[in-house]
């Protein structure tokens, strides 16, 4: 995990005496590319492969130069299904992180996700970043819907099984 602030990369902030909000040493707004060579082991063959990026701004993911997809959600982790693009062997994984304001509605800029009073408009990736190999069937998503007046919770699951049909009762 890293940010431009931690690396000291970007435009030098000469107004470090500011006391009304956060005062960063450097600022950066725009696209940044992060590349890593990954070696997918034979043990991943036949499994679903997901890339997880826990905390970031807008991302676009590429495998061996081919665009896989984008996510601009700043509230939840980004998850990409790379199953069709990764197979055993070496691959180049590229993640574009772009904190440019053009990707977000104007109303977001005074929210905690961007203001210099709370966390700033940082660029980078924080938290866990990992590839996950999952066997079928697997839980794709979980949603909990609380109903306090009934003292109950409804659980909504999406279970995927892409290789063989199975019947289950929950």
Task: Label each region the model flagged.
Residues 14-15, 20, 113:
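Hydrophobic alpha-helical segments, principally membrane-spanning helices and signal/leader peptides
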Residues 21-24, 170:
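Low-complexity, intrinsically disordered short segments enriched for Gly/Pro and polybasic residues
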Residues 61-63, 152-170:
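Beta-strand-rich binding/interaction modules
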Residues 1-15, 92, 96, 100-103:
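Accessory carbohydrate-binding/adhesion or oligomerization-edge regions at the termini
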Residues 145-151:
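Short, solvent-exposed loop/linker segments at the N-terminal edge
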Residues 24-138, 162-163:
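Accessory beta-strand-rich segments of carbohydrate-active enzymes
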Residues 18-21, 28-31, 80, 144, ...:
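Extracellular/oxidizing-compartment recognition motifs
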